[in-house]
Amino acid sequence: MNMISKEGAFIMAKVFITLTGTKHYFGNDFLEKGTRIRLEKEPDNEYDKEAIQVKMKGLGKIGYVANSPFTVKGESMSAGRSYDKIGDKAKGRVIFVVDGGVVCRIINTGKEQNLVIEKEQNSD
């Protein structure tokens, strides 16, 4: 899944996740394409050991990475599939806001060897 660029940096293939559960926090009306998010693993979650919180600067937790076939949208990875692909913390960006979820792209996995290099700011 990873490739090495001419400069020797690792480039990760595009990985999408679905942000879900926003109605339990602030809703998703304020989210739009390009909004930056942070992902944080929550290994002590009593319901899901692969839970990944989604946070925003200034608001804190706004939801979770979807981990059910009923909440994962399109080509997104579930929290279970993406859990080992990110460090304890990662960064993402909103791509689409759709009914029942928000599709986001992981732009930095939080792992040194998996730094995502974006050639274009708005290539999505």
How would you name each of these model-derived features?
Residues 1-124:
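Conserved active-site motif detector
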